[in-house]
Regions:
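N-terminal core-entry segment
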Residues: 1-158
Length: 159
């Protein structure tokens, strides 16, 4: 996923949505193809996962941009992880609660600064690959346990 995600945006030939969400195809396709190689997935499930990833990217991107970039964050790195987690969650058939947890975990993988713009670094090429990996790592965390905050301490329980 890291290699395919990096390659998907590395040559700057990928899709682009200028009102938010960056490059949803670059964050969706590597993840759903990797999961489809590991389990049986129908064409309809692939398309549904792709559409869900695009939709998540557009909605989250529109909510965060342009402020995200003016604060120094690369939109694809920050939003792409949610795109990837949503697409992976659809392929893995997560229920709404599991998807919520996957997206919450994806938030911890979100990041990537625009420093490459100032220094000419090539790390930008890696941002989408890292977003794909973060989204993929976020989604399998759907075990039947739940962590919540009590009044004074964190308590994890199993159902």
């Amino acid at each position: 996923v890291l290699v395919n995600g990096t390659f998907a945006q590395g040559c700057e030939l990928d899709d682009y949505y200028d009102q938010g969400g960056g490059h949803p195809g670059a964050a969706t396709v590597p993840v759903i193809l990797a999961l489809a190689q590991q389990q049986t997935v129908s064409g309809q499930e692939l398309i549904t996962a792709m559409v869900a990833g695009f939709e998540a990217g557009w909605r989250i991107g529109r909510a965060l941009l342009p402020e995200l970039m003016t604060r120094g964050y690369h939109a694809q790195s920050a939003v792409g992880v949610f795109i990837a987690a949503t697409a992976a969650g659809k392929i893995l058939r997560l229920d709404p609660e599991q998807m919520t947890h996957a997206l919450a975990i994806a938030g911890s993988h979100s990041g990537g600064t625009m420093e490459y713009d100032q220094s000419g670094g090539e790390v930008k090429r890696l941002h989408n690959g890292m977003a794909c990996c973060g989204g993929l790592r976020s989604s399998p965390w759907r075990a039947p346990s739940r962590c919540s905050w009590s009044s004074r301490k964190s308590a994890c329980t199993t159902r």
